Structures are given as structure tokens and as C-alpha cells.
Design a protein with these regions (language model features):
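Short, low-complexity disordered leader/linker segments with a strong preference
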Residues: 1-32, 389-393
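A residue-level marker of the well-folded mature domains of exported/periplasmic proteins
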Residues: 25-393
Length: 393
């Protein structure tokens, strides 16, 4: 009897130990989380800051060692150096926000010494990663594999989360027209797939709202050719606002500065991107400039993935996958991975309210409203006249 009791007690003691392990036997306490910034800092009020805050909150709450590392400069080599530094320091979950980490993943994912490290990349698409396997000609077109024995792939120690940008772009365009704006602009950074999806979604949303209101809308459309603002881009924005553009969706890193500078001078408006940019834009350029922001759920994607890997032990569900995140809840818009902000969007009674937004999200979730993610051609529209101006640089 005593022997049986001892066996039962021993088995019971194993239960919490097993619960703290993932499927490979790694215990929660064995994990250390590092975040590498792309080329900004954790105060950028965008990708880096949001990812940092999600990592820190999760790790603090679960008593997990966490540190962030900032590369010395904006290059793949400098980002790889920080990844290596973090791993040398014992960090075995590496979180990397932004498409700029595609080259980093390409260089580290197949290293034998990193096979047990888990790389979590946000907004690194299949296009971004697989493009690194190729040589390119002077036009940027692919010109054959760098190594014929190393074909494009994603390794089992990598998970990438990407987003349905066309959906939150649609929401932003729909909201802008519903709020009464009929002269719009889209200023993209570089014409990479994510930015194009934002832009084409914006066009589709504006057209849908214009149809409902039986209005005609004009929309200027251009790419800056870079992810930062400068005098040349600001000059184009000055021209747009000067000729009647009311609000510009500035989509691409720091390129919003050119739109916001021009908007401030002309009394115009802007729409932010990726995160709720109202605080940073309004804080620098004037209260009320930001109409809304087309947001990606960087925070929940980071937090949820860390929980799934560390607490739930479900890395096998993520390993070697590139997963596209979008709408997951038709009843609570704040739980989705793509959305516009409830707090800072300039909702207006009789035009576009929080209830109107909730209905839009519900209809999108239920499939009553569909949005194309085709990036090969400008969407077909009926009530929006698009002036596609190509690119500035």
C-alpha cells in the first residue's frame, strides 16, 4: 500500500513539470527572449516599440528573461551581428519585427548551431525571404539562384507572421470617404507587396463608401520609392494639398513625415499606418491631423506567439510556416490582427460611427464584403477616379 501511494505521489509531482515543457521537452524556465530592432529604436511608436512592449509585458508577467538589442546600423550584416550576440548570450527565442529581417533569416536559419533557436519574424513575407535566395540584375529582377543547391525555403526554426494589409487599407479608405473626404491621396513607400496591398485596399474601401453615398471621389496615387520622407517627396505632397487633396494615406515607415509636413502647412489631414500613429503625428504636426490609422496587430501577434511557444508548448504548430493574419472575430473589432483604432479614429455621428465600423468589420468577417489582395493591377472602381502617378524616385 505504501509503495502504491509513493508511486501515485511521484506521478502527481510530474504533472506540473510536464505542463511547463513544450513538445520537445523544453521547460518554460529554459527560454530567454531577445528582440532585435530593425533600424530604428524602441521609441519609434511603430514596429519596434509595439513589438518591444509586447515582448516585455509577456516576459515580465511570466518571469522570463528578456532583452532587446539594437544594431549599430541599417544593414543585414549589422542585424545578423546582433542576432549572434543575443544567441551567444543564451537567448533562444529571437523576435524580429519588419521585412528588413528577411536577409537576416536567410543567413541564420540554416546554421547548424542555431537549429534549436526559435526565430519569430513579423511582417517578413514569403516574397521577402525567398527573394534573398536569388542574384539580381541591374533592374532588380531575379537572375538565378545564388546557390543552385540552396533553393528557396523556410526552415523549421523559423515562423513568420504577415498580415492582410488590404483589409485594414480598405477600412481606412472606407472610413475616410464616409467621414466626408472626397479628395484623397495614397503615398506609398516602396512598391513592395505589403505596401501595394495597403494601397489597393484603400482604393477599394474608398470606392465602396463612395458607391453607398452616391459620390464621386478623386484619388492621387504614388510611391515615394523609399521608406522615409525628404524634401522631394514633401514637394509632391505640397502640390497635392495645394490642388485640393484633403487627406493622404502615408504608407511606408517614416515617409509619413513628408505628408504630415505638407498637411500642416495646408490644413490637411493624414492617415497613419501599421500602428496607431495619431500620437506621434498629432504630437509633432498638430492636434487632429490624423484621421485614422490602418493598423496591423503587431502586439497580439507577438504576445500570442510567445504564449503559444513558451506556455502552451506549440512550436510545432508554427515551425517552418509563414502565416497570414487577418480577421479572427466578427463581433469585437479590437481582437483582429488588422483594424483601425477605436480610440483615435475621428468617428462622427451621422457620418461614420463606432457602430458603423463594427458593422463593416462584421460584414467583412462574414464574407458579405470582400476585398481583393491582387497586387498585379489597380482595382477596378466605379466611383473613384484614380490618378496613378507612378513613383517619385
Amino acid at each position: 500500500m505504501k509503495k502504491l501511494l509513493a508511486i501515485i505521489l511521484a506521478a502527481l509531482m510530474l504533472v506540473p513539470m510536464l505542463a511547463a515543457c513544450d513538445r520537445s521537452g523544453t521547460q518554460k524556465g529554459d527560454y530567454k527572449v531577445a528582440m532585435i530592432t530593425d533600424y530604428g529604436d524602441i521609441t519609434d511608436q511603430s514596429f519596434n516599440q509595439t513589438t518591444y512592449e509586447a515582448c516585455k509585458e509577456y516576459c515580465d508577467a511570466n518571469k522570463i528573461d528578456f532583452q532587446y538589442f539594437k544594431p549599430a546600423g541599417d544593414s543585414t550584416e549589422e542585424r545578423v551581428a546582433k542576432v549572434e550576440e543575443a544567441i551567444d548570450g543564451g537567448y533562444n527565442i529571437i523576435v524580429m519585427p519588419g521585412f528588413a529581417f528577411a536577409g537576416t533569416l536567410y543567413q541564420v536559419q540554416d546554421k547548424e548551431e542555431y537549429k534549436d533557436v526559435k526565430f519569430i519574424a513579423l511582417d517578413v513575407s514569403e516574397y521577402d525571404l525567398f527573394d534573398c535566395f536569388y542574384k539580381h540584375d541591374e533592374t532588380g529582377a531575379r537572375a538565378g539562384l545564388i546557390d543552385e543547391n540552396n533553393k528557396e525555403h523556410i526552415s523549421e526554426n523559423v515562423y513568420c507572421a504577415v498580415y492582410k494589409e488590404e483589409l485594414c487599407g480598405y477600412m481606412a479608405g472606407y472610413a475616410a470617404v464616409k467621414l466626408g473626404y472626397t479628395h484623397l491621396g495614397f503615398l506609398g513607400g516602396m512598391a513592395v507587396p505589403a505596401v501595394v496591398r495597403y494601397g489597393y485596399g484603400f482604393v477599394q474601401g474608398a470606392d465602396a463608401a463612395a458607391k453607398e453615398l452616391d459620390k464621386k471621389v478623386e484619388l492621387n496615387y504614388i510611391y515615394g520609392g523609399q521608406f522615409n520622407g525628404d524634401a522631394d517627396i514633401t514637394a509632391v505632397m505640397d502640390t497635392w494639398y495645394g490642388k485640393g487633396t484633403e487627406v493622404v494615406f502615408a504608407c511606408g515607415g517614416g515617409i509619413y513625415t513628408s505628408a504630415a509636413e505638407a498637411a500642416k502647412k495646408a490644413g490637411g489631414k493624414v492617415i497613419g499606418v501599421d500602428v496607431d500613429q495619431a500620437a506621434i503625428i498629432d504630437g509633432k504636426y498638430g492636434k487632429g491631423i490624423t484621421v485614422t490609422s490602418a493598423m496591423k496587430g503587431l502586439y497580439p501577434a507577438t504576445y500570442d506567439t510567445l504564449k503559444a511557444v513558451i506556455i502552451d508548448g506549440k512550436w510545432a504548430d508554427y515551425a517552418g510556416k509563414i502565416v497570414t493574419l487577418g480577421l479572427v472575430n466578427g463581433d469585437d473589432a479590437t481582437k483582429n490582427y488588422v483594424q483601425i483604432p477605436m480610440d483615435s479614429t475621428q468617428f462622427a455621428d451621422g457620418k461614420f460611427t463606432k457602430d458603423d465600423y463594427a458593422k463593416l468589420v462584421k460584414d467583412m468577417f462574414d464574407g458579405k464584403v470582400t476585398v481583393s489582395n491582387d497586387t498585379t493591377k489597380m482595382p477596378t472602381v466605379t466611383n473613384v477616379t484614380v490618378d496613378d502617378q507612378g513613383k517619385i524616385k
